[in-house]
UniProtKB/Swiss-Prot annotation:
Disulfide bonds: none annotated. This is Protein nucleotidyltransferase YdiU. The active site is at residue 268. One of its GO terms (molecular function) is magnesium ion binding. Nucleotidyltransferase involved in the post-translational modification of proteins. It can catalyze the addition of adenosine monophosphate (AMP) or uridine monophosphate (UMP) to a protein, resulting in modifications known as AMPylation and UMPylation. The gene is ydiU. Its EC number is 2.7.7.-, 2.7.7.108. Mg(2+) binds at residues 269, 278. Belongs to the SELO family. Its cofactor is Mg(2+); Mn(2+). The keyword Protease does not apply.
């Protein structure tokens, strides 16, 4: 049995990344291993049989065959302010691997040591944030949200020093790629059009190869020119941008559907592939309010729950700016060509939001008046501080047994008749639709925090594994589900999240 990595991103050249080895750790020990994900990635090892080898590979102590580790370069707008040089300050891209369907996936270590992008950081990660990323990404995957995932968490046997000493860990992240809006900004800020072309061509081949096929079919020249590093047409760039936009719509709408608050939607945390990335300061909605913020560093509520659609539009506009030189040498003409795509993106997001929220109350095809029905509901939820998940679960259950929980009936007594009248003729199909769009359990903040504390204190994963088993079936009730459905007794008072990984 062997595991061999390819190095497709590394082949782009030294301007895209820094070659650097992970820093060895003292006593690596495999804590969590994502067996289903490993199987999908055709990784031929198991925790039971290969724990020692896996701890060496995924701590960075031993290189996987074929691996040429790099720290990737990128820029980014952080809370609206541009930083021209960010990059992987404590992460190493080991390489990429194909899954059983032939799709390629990046394998990246986080907390694996310093690079030229570390900015005085120590390059390390504490165990708590590593566990948070594992829990949250697995929960989001099960909820049907596009997301990066965690393959492994390895403890290092060393302390990480923050406000106090913590156990250290290295987490392995799997992503369709780690190309960010900030990656494009990195080269645009430097006026490096050749590298922008190279990056765009790579991103098309990696994520949207159908654009190459379409261009080849429509071209009078069917030579290998389209495959060359820097040969890319204006039309291809526009089609690429449109394809990237289409990836962001299900991403941000899925966040809103399940009550997820990312917390740090900087352009360096916005992927071209449309995957959720960076779970450091994320949280889940309890009592509904569109201005909910948990991130301790989001002091101006820039990334509040209800602002996530508008921020995604802002981020995509920043991506559009980087592509202008590839669209047309005349900037005004380039803007004229790319602006309609952003306008359409805005319209698609608005329509998508209506369709998503309508599905949460059992309406498959929104009609005139449904927008008001939805707005009336969420206004009541905000005013009465109703729990986001529990409200939609109760409405779903009411179609199954024709009763609504008394507290909810009291609060929604004026709204419920309008809703019942709207879905009267298709209650059975409405119930089916609601079941698939309204999770009965989410990774609630207080439960996640409790497991992070207990795992760090005791090292016992028994209870955490039960929690993960529930989170992996968020639309189906199993024996343990009821243990994790409760909202926090004191609400979200004084709850804050922090960047960790």
């Amino acid at each position: 049995m062997s595991l061999i990595l390819s190095n497709n991103y590394q082949a782009l050249g030294e301007s895209f990344s820094q070659q650097t080895l992970p820093a060895p750790v003292g006593q690596p020990s495999l804590l969590l291993w994502n067996e289903p994900l490993a199987k999908a990635l055709t990784i031929p090892f198991t925790k039971d049989n290969d724990a020692e080898l896996l701890s060496q590979y995924f701590s960075g102590n031993q290189l996987i065959e074929g691996s040429k580790p790099v720290a990737q370069a990128y820029s980014g707008h952080q809370f609206g302010h541009f930083n021209p040089q960010l990059g992987d300050g404590r992460a190493h891209l080991l390489g990429d691997i194909a899954d059983t369907q032939g799709q390629r996936w990046d394998i990246q270590l986080k907390g694996s040591g310093v690079s030229d992008f570390s900015r005085q950081g120590d390059g390390r990660c504490a165990l708590g944030p590593a566990l948070r990323e594992y829990i949250m990404s697995e929960a989001m995957f099960a909820l049907g949200v596009p997301t990066t995932r965690c393959l492994a968490v390895v403890t290092t046997g060393e302390n990480v020093y923050r406000e106090r000493p913590y156990d250290g860990a290295v987490v392995t992240r799997i992503a369709a790629s780690h190309i960010r809006v900030g990656t494009f900004q990195y080269f645009a800020a430097r006026g490096d059009t050749d590298s922008l072309k190279k990056l765009t061509n790579y991103a098309i081949n990696r994520h949207f190869p159908e654009l190459i096929a379409n261009s080849s079919e429509n071209s009078s020249d069917n030579s290998d020119a389209l495959k060359a590093d820097n040969v890319i047409s204006s039309q291809q760039v526009l089609e690429f941008f449109s394809a990237v936009l289409s990836k962001q719509i299900p991403l941000v709408l899925s966040w809103l559907r399940v009550g997820f608050i990312h917390g740090v939607m900087n352009t360096d945390n916005t992927t071209i592939s449309g995957e959720t990335i960076d779970y450091g300061p994320c949280a889940m909605m309890n009592a509904y309010h569109p201005e909910t913020v948990f991130s301790s560093i989001d002091r101006n509520s820039r990334y509040a729950f209800g602002k996530q659609i508008s921020i995604m539009q802002w981020n995509m506009t920043r991506l559009a700016e980087t592509l202008l030189p590839l669209v047309d040498s005349d900037e005004d003409d380039a803007v004229e060509k790319i602006e309609p795509l952003l306008t359409q993106f805005h319209q698609d997001l608005q329509q998508g939001y209506l369709t998503m929220m309508a599905a949460k109350i059992g309406i498959d095809e929104p009609a005139e008046g449904d927008g008001k029905l939805i707005n009336d509901l969420i206004t009541l939820m905000k005013e009465q501080k109703l729990d986001y998940t529990q409200t939609f679960t109760a409405l779903t259950d009411s179609l199954n047994d024709n009763t609504t929980e008394e507290p909810l009936t009291d609060v929604l007594n004026e709204w419920l008749p309008h809703w019942n009248s709207r879905i009267e003729s298709f209650k059975s199909s409405a119930h089916t639709l609601m079941v698939s769009n309204n999770p009965i359990v989410i990774p609630r903040n207080h439960h996640v925090e409790a497991f992070l504390d207990s795992c760090q204190e005791t090292g016992d994963l028994t209870a955490l594994n039960k929690f993960l088993a529930v989170l992996r079936q968020p639309y189906t009730e199993i024996a343990e589900t009821k243990n994790y459905q409760d909202a926090p007794v004191d609400g979200d008072k004084d709850y804050h999240t922090f960047c960790g990984t």
